[in-house]
Each structure stands twice: as structure tokens, then as C-alpha cells.
Curated annotation (Swiss-Prot):
NCBIfam families named in the record: S16
Family (UniProt): Belongs to the bacterial ribosomal protein bS16 family.
Locations listed in the record: Plastid, Chloroplast
Listed name of the protein: Small ribosomal subunit protein bS16c
Keywords: Chloroplast, Plastid, Ribonucleoprotein, Ribosomal protein
The species this protein was found in: Amborella trichopoda
Length: 78
């Protein structure tokens, strides 16, 4: 099963999260199937590759609660 979840990147005290499609059994920072966006909580910036997100959702991927909320704010789910 595939999930859309956050992968931690950046440096100490300056975190950035990538939104990735990843297998459920993989670790948080494990190898992702595809990068579909990023989220910067400090600058409150978000970038989402909407066609890629919709593709994975059509294939049965489940977003985590946080990714769902971020996507909702970015108006991926209308």
C-alpha cells in the first residue's frame, strides 16, 4: 500500500518537509516512489504537484492527516 506522507529534510533547527509517495513499510526518510511537493513550516510555503497527487490518489494511495490538511489548504481537494 502506498501513502502520501512527509519526509524530513533540511538542517538542524531549519526543517523542510517533502511530500512523497512512499510504501507503508518504508521508514520516514526511506526511498520514496516519487516526490510530489514540499512544505516549509517556517516560511509557511507549500508546493504541490497536483497531477501527481491526484494520480496516486486514483491508484489508491492514502494521505496522512497532515498531508491531507496541507493539500486541503492548497485546494487540491475541492
Amino acid at each position: 500500500m502506498v501513502k502520501l506522507r512527509l519526509k524530513r529534510c533540511g538542517r538542524k533547527q531549519r526543517v523542510i518537509y517533502r511530500i512523497v509517495a512512499i510504501d507503508v513499510r518504508s521508514r520516514r526518510d526511506g526511498r520514496a516512489l516519487r516526490k510530489v511537493g514540499f512544505y516549509d513550516p517556517i516560511k509557511n510555503q507549500t508546493y504541490s504537484n497536483v497531477p501527481a497527487i491526484l494520480y496516486f490518489l486514483e491508484k489508491g494511495a492514502q494521505p496522512t492527516v497532515t498531508v491531507h490538511d496541507i493539500s486541503k489548504k492548497a485546494e487540491v481537494f475541492k
